[in-house]
């Protein structure tokens, strides 16, 4: 679960055929993350160690983008500028280049905690509810920034997006409530899936909060705070549980590589394909592939209402990602 933008810029724009290939590769990378988690949870690996190794990859990538730019050396003076610019920035003016360094830290630290929790709940969700439902709920997290944007900035969705939101809420209810047995409707309630939905959504929202007020120049520093904090929290939890097994650590590295390339290929695909095409296909196809792989490779069997919830999720993600 890396953010959708690293600050990559392709040296040249690929053709539409190449962009479509990049989109396919992004989908495959995103799908493989959930499937690797299924393997790690089936073998009961230490999820904190897996998460630590993943965020080591992410932190290393962020550091590579910061190398030689001198942003870290400017953090000390940036604190005072950040406090001076804060009132004006929150009124809609945004931060300047120096103040954005402080904003990167202010938003990046709590965002790192959300990213850590999102990865933990994704792994728990895969173990408790299967890879199909867990993958669906992690993708549904996009609804959280949409809802908060309505409340905070009055960004009203289109009629089509409202339809997608309604379908998404329906899928959440179907997955968590057994409507066929009203007396025990809440017996199927899964707090882990809801926590997965919320933490992934808040992690995505942190990106929007940074981008709304901060400068793109400091985006790499923001990512370093996000991944660095997630790494520190997960490393602390890993060290508390005892010996770290090499197989668990290598599995985490195996997650980190597709996690990185999912974002990389997604950005490359956007150079020739429209956003309104890329994101619905990316989200919906990933869920379909995860569900198919869950059934074929791991013999997961969803109940009828859970299958319907996955179908509604796919439809909802297509609709909410459609742009004006």
Language-model regions, residue ranges each:
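Polytopic alpha-helical membrane proteins, predominantly small-molecule transporters/carriers
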Residues: 4, 12-324
